[in-house]
Amino acid sequence: MRNLLNQIIEEIAGPIVLLDESFSNETISDKNLSNSRFYKCEFKNIVFDTVIFRKSEFSQCRFQNCQILGSDLTRVEFGNTSFTSCEFKQVDLSGSLFTNAQFSETKFEEILLIGLILSDLKIKTTTFHDLEFSKTYPVRIHKLKKVRKVSNLNSFQEILADFYFE
């Protein structure tokens, strides 16, 4: 079914809860999906443009060839979620949590990372440019029960090198 995700968003007109759904080849623009829950969902070739996902949750989801542009992902939780060939551009990830997430061939550009928490990541061929950090609320990176606080790009990339896989 074409534009299934857009149809669901229009019908519900508020926070949505989705389980075991698959979406492809859609553009979602100027929507507020705050407090939504996505479980075991697959997103292929989806463009999220100026979408508010504040306080939403993605658990065991897969994103492939997706673009997340100019969007608000503050305090969003991503658990056991994978991103392959995706692009995050001009996105606010402040206060968000990525646990057991996997990034492969993904780009991050012009990203706000205030208070972001990263835990047990797997990263492959992923690039980071124009990231904004905070010394007051640094990025916290967890690995094997050790926590590192990061407030600049050099230390961020140095620590993330430990998460790269072949």
Task: Please give the residue ranges for each predicted region.
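Tandem repeat scaffolds
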Residues: M1-E166
